[in-house]
Structure formats: C-alpha cells, structure tokens
Regions:
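Cytosolic beta-strand hydrophobic patch enriched in CBS
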Residues: 1-7
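Glycine-rich acetyl-CoA-binding "A-motif" of GNAT/NAT acetyltransferases
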Residues: 9-14
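Conserved acyl-donor/pantetheine-binding loop and adjacent beta-alpha core of acyl/acetyltransferases
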Residues: 15-50
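A short, internal acetyl-CoA/4′-phosphopantetheine-binding micro-motif in the GNAT/acyltransferase core
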Residues: 49-59
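Conserved acetyl-CoA-binding loop-helix of GNAT-fold acetyltransferases
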Residues: 59-73, 101
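Short glycine/proline-centered loop/turn elements that form peptide/ligand docking sites
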Residues: 67, 92-95, 109-119
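Conserved active-site alpha-helix within GNAT-family acetyltransferase domains
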Residues: 75, 81, 88-109
C-alpha cells in the first residue's frame, strides 16, 4: 500500500496498492494478442488493486499524480518481475473516463465494471525507461 500525505500531516489523502498476478488472454481483443500471448491462457499482469483519493482532494490532480507514481513503480517492478500490462477494474463511468483520459484501454466485455490495461511497453516509454 502506497499512501499520499500533505506535508507535515499524518492524514492519508490518497493511496494505491499493486499486486502481481495473471488475467485471461481470452478477454483480450485480438489487436492486443501478439504471437507470444496466443500461446497462453493467461497473461502476467501487475494489477492496480486499489486506488482512492479523499473526497475533499478529488478533481485537483492528485489521482493523476498517484497514477504517474504507479507507472514509475511499475517500470521499477518490471526490472525484477515480468508482466505484460498494468491492469485494473474500473468501478464506475467517471473512473472509466478518467483512466481512458490516461490512455488505459478497456479489454473486457463487462460494461458495468470494465477491465482496463496499460501495456508495459507504453509505460516504459512514458516514464523514459525505454
């Protein structure tokens, strides 16, 4: 669990948690299946399990800052553990729109709680690790 605080305050104003795991290749759109993934039933993923911003700090850019920290941490984790993409499950239309604005892509057919991903290759380019 990674927490954001205001300087000098013990109060948490935002947080996130990451978890290594797998997800089903069959849910990926064909455009996301490269030759490597076609040979497997699951793809390795770094899942953004939890992310939240305190209500009084929402819509002030903190979520974007947290996600940039997630991307930097994902790049660092990729030096020690292999995975195809950063994944998450969006919980509502507002969060889906937020993640799409950061270039996450929906890869499941569940329209209420869509699964979204950001390929590691794109993360490495974004943080300048390529």
């Amino acid at each position: 669990m990674f927490c954001a605080h205001l300087d000098g305050s013990p109060n948490v104003i935002g947080y996130y948690a990451l978890q290594l795991g797998t997800d089903s290749v069959s849910e990926l759109p064909d455009a996301n299946k490269d030759n490597y993934l076609k040979n497997y039933v699951a793809f390795p993923a770094l899942n953004l399990s939890f992310v939240a911003v305190d209500e009084q700090f929402q819509r002030q850019g903190l979520g974007g800052h947290l996600l940039m920290d997630v991307f930097a941490r994902a790049a660092a984790i990729s030096e020690h553990a292999g995975f195809y993409a950063l994944t998450l499950t969006s919980m509502n239309a507002d969060s889906t729109a937020f993640y799409e604005s950061l270039n996450f892509r929906i890869y499941s057919e569940n329209t209420k709680f869509p699964k979204m991903l950001y390929p590691l290759e794109d993360i490495l380019t974004l943080v300048g690790a390529n």
